[in-house]
Amino acid sequence: MDLKAYFELIRLKNCLTAGFGALISGLIASNFTFGALFPLILAFLVVFFICGFGNSLNDIYDLKIDRINKPFRPIPSKRISLTDAKVFSYSIMIFGLIISLFNIYCFLMAVLNAVVLQKYAKIYKKNKIIGNMLVAYLTGSVFIFGGIAVGNVNVSLYLFSCAMFSMWAREIIKDYEDIEGDLKEKVSSLPIKYGEKSIYISLGLLLIAIGLSFLPYLTGIFGIYYLLMILICNLMFLAGFFNLLNAPSKKQARKTSKNIKLITNFVLIAFIIGSIFK
């Protein structure tokens, strides 16, 4: 068994990132209570396995395209057979669902996300207008999952909302970058439908995320240290975005997309600081 190939199939780095997102969100929601550590370790494992399931499914359904565009991937390179990939992907999904039974609400959300991942891989990768929304939800859901695991979703809801809208904006920008390839593959996306106007739709979603990011301070959950850091993050968001508005191009779209992903990590740090220094 080629472990490296299976790690590549599930996209190990993405699975670890998602798992740690749930873990950190749960720690914030529990005010870093030691007793929350065990359910959060379980939450980490659930998110890791369900994310791995989704990533594996993407490779299974993309086999025809990957034979041409990405022949080095585990399945087209025949390091993993298609049958073995299917057995493996559904096995880790089952493992994830079994572990999620430690909390009925975690179990229900794990089932929901597994279904969404299945539908996305099978149907909505070609329809990015809906697909982007699903990816945004899935990204944000890891944070609310951590809150559910410790029985407190108040802060996690803010993290979920900010992450969902900022990632939704990012997905549209990525589509703007990929517009030529998507046209060839007959994929529907907002940039294909609306051209440069789609950048303003993306900006609108980002502004919603920015507006929501102030709520933890305005509602008294976090204090001035959170506010200062979130202000810096939001200014960085806007500065990068206006560069794209002033000079829309594939290169600038790629840069803006990377910036949003990076700054979202700083937003998570702002939530950590806010929860520690109230």
From Swiss-Prot:
The lineage of its organism: Archaea, Methanobacteriati, Methanobacteriota, Methanomada group, Methanococci. It is a multi-pass membrane protein. The chain crosses the membrane at residues 12-32, 34-54, 92-112, 129-149, 199-219, 221-241, 257-277. This is Digeranylgeranylglyceryl phosphate synthase. One of its GO terms (cellular component) is plasma membrane. GO terms for molecular function: geranylgeranylglycerol-phosphate geranylgeranyltransferase activity; magnesium ion binding. Keywords: Cell membrane, Lipid biosynthesis, Lipid metabolism, Magnesium, Membrane, Phospholipid biosynthesis, Phospholipid metabolism, Transferase, Transmembrane, Transmembrane helix. Its cofactor is Mg(2+). It is an enzyme of class 2 (transferase). Its EC number is 2.5.1.42. It catalyses: sn-3-O-(geranylgeranyl)glycerol 1-phosphate + (2E,6E,10E)-geranylgeranyl diphosphate = 2,3-bis-O-(geranylgeranyl)-sn-glycerol 1-phosphate + diphosphate. It comes from the Archaea. GO terms for biological process: glycerophospholipid biosynthetic process. Its main location: membrane. Pathway: Membrane lipid metabolism; glycerophospholipid metabolism. Prenyltransferase that catalyzes the transfer of the geranylgeranyl moiety of geranylgeranyl diphosphate (GGPP) to the C2 hydroxyl of (S)-3-O-geranylgeranylglyceryl phosphate (GGGP). This reaction is the second ether-bond-formation step in the biosynthesis of archaeal membrane lipids. Belongs to the UbiA prenyltransferase family. DGGGP synthase subfamily. It is found in: Cell membrane.
